[in-house]
Every structure is written in structure tokens, then in C-alpha cells.
């Protein structure tokens, strides 16, 4: 009887120990599950952060592409402005050459007109001198008449030349007037071109400042991309570490669950053994 009691006490003690171990296993399993859930939550959080970083990186790359496109457009605008400036300078040069040729033609026509006027004046003075003398000598008169005829002929020729010169002068004056109009137009155009050049110069300065700012923004974007890439790699490393931790915790949970099942089976075996012992005692 004492042996049975001792056996029962031992079995009870073993049962209590099994219960304690089962409770401990259950608590450890719950703790492991909590740690696994926490690790999974951290992994999900890291995954969200990685997604956010990837989105930020995509946005930054898109902004960088837009900045590069704007910079290309500004380069094209700068090239167009330089071409316009070159064309305007060429037009100014052509206008100046045209004005210079017109001034030369005007100077030549003025000199010819002065020569014709001087010849006409000399002929007229000679005629008046011959008339005032009143020479009686017929031969002298004939000579004078011949001289007068020559003078008249010269005067007529001079008149013709004068008319021709006057006609040419009128043409030259018309050309001069048109040249002056073109010169005035050219001057006003030069003023407009100078204003356009000033505006183009300001635009060039603005483009240079914009290009410098764009370069600074590009450097900032590159630095930001570098920082985001580093953060992405760090987040991926943390995610991999968290995933390994989750796998490790899951293995620990599986081990504790297996141990719990084993303890429960052991506890059931002890209970069955106690029941059998009680049945034998009652039967005796």
C-alpha cells in the first residue's frame, strides 16, 4: 500500500511537473507568437518604407528628366537667339553698306553739277563781254559771232549737260531720298534691333542664371537619389534581417508547439496511468 501511495505521489508530482512544463511551453509559445507577430509587423512596416522610398526615387527621377528636358529647351532657345542675333547683325551691315554707296553716288552727282554750273557761268560771262564791246569790225564780228555760236553751242551743250545732270541729280536726289528713308528706317530698325539685342542679352543672362540653377537642382537631385538609394539598400537589408528573424521565430514556435504536444501526450499518459491505478485500488 505504501508503495502504491509513493507511486501515486510520484505520479502526481510528475503530473504537476508536466502541467508546469506544459504551461511554460504554452507561455513560451505565446511569447514566440507575439515576437513573430511583432517581427512580421516590423517587416510590413519596412516593406511600406521601401515602397515609399521607391516612389520617392521614381518621383525624383521624373523631376530630373523634366529638368533635363527644360534645360534642352533652353539650350535650343539660346541657339535660336544667337542665330537671330547673327542675322540681325548681317542685316545691319547690309544697310550700312547700302547707305555708304548712296552717299558716294550723291557726292559724285554734286561734283558733276558744280562743274556744269561753272562752265555755263563762264560761257554766259564771255557772251556778255562780247556784246558789250560792240566791235565794228566785221571780221571781228564774224569771229565774235563764230565765238558766240561756239559759246551758244557750248551753252546749249552745257544746258543739255545741265538738264542731263539735273535729271540725274533728280534721280540721285530720289535715290538719296529713298536712301535717307531706308537710312531712317535702318536707324529705327537699328534701334529696334539694339532693343531686341538688349532683350536677347537679358534673356541670355536669364538663361545662364536658369541654367546655373538647373545645374544646382540637378546636383541636389543626384545627391537626393544617392541618399534614397542608400536608404533603400539599408531598408532592404533590415527587411532581409527581419525576414530571417521571423523565420527563426517561426521555427522556435514550431519547436515549442511540438514540445507542448509531447508534454500533453505525456500528461495524458500519466492521467491514464493514474486512472488505471485508482481502478485497481478500488477493485482490490
UniProtKB/Swiss-Prot annotation:
InterPro entries: Tropomyosin. Signal peptide: none annotated. Residues 1-284 form a coiled coil. It holds the Pfam family Tropomyosin. Keywords: Coiled coil, Repeat. It comes from the Eukaryota. Gene3D superfamilies: 1.20.5.170, 1.20.5.340. Tropomyosin, in association with the troponin complex, plays a central role in the calcium dependent regulation of muscle contraction. Belongs to the tropomyosin family. The molecule is in a coiled coil structure that is formed by 2 polypeptide chains. The sequence exhibits a prominent seven-residues periodicity. Homodimer. This is Tropomyosin.
